[in-house]
Amino acid sequence: MEIKNYNNDIPDDYYEVMSILQDRNGTLITLDGINNEVKIRFGAVDSICDTDEGSRMETYLNGKTKELNEYRAKKFYGNPFFVATAETDFTLWLKKESWGFSEGVGHYLIITLNDIVDIASAFPPQEIIINKKKQ
């Protein structure tokens, strides 16, 4: 899987997934860092999967891209939001399961020290909200 950072505006930090909320308004993923809180809102999501990093060692430790390897080398300090640059096992699985209706969806990933969140969506995030914490 080839991935790259999706949004370079997200400040470097040590992030954890605080919540994933899905309702009729879409999907809201909240990341909590030492200095920042980031909210990523998707409108329509075809599939979302939150997995403990210990169950995703192939992705977590065997990063095949420079950006992921650098992020991992810094002990997951940085920008945790990535996008796949080609079809992945996740999007191919979704395409098969949907009988082709989910063709062309993007695969977005949030990779933190403890979680990997896979998001399949035909549309990029509607908004990314960055709140600087008061020290």
Describe the residue ranges of each PLM region.
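Surface-exposed, interaction-prone regions used to assemble/regulate multi-protein complexes
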Residues: 1-135
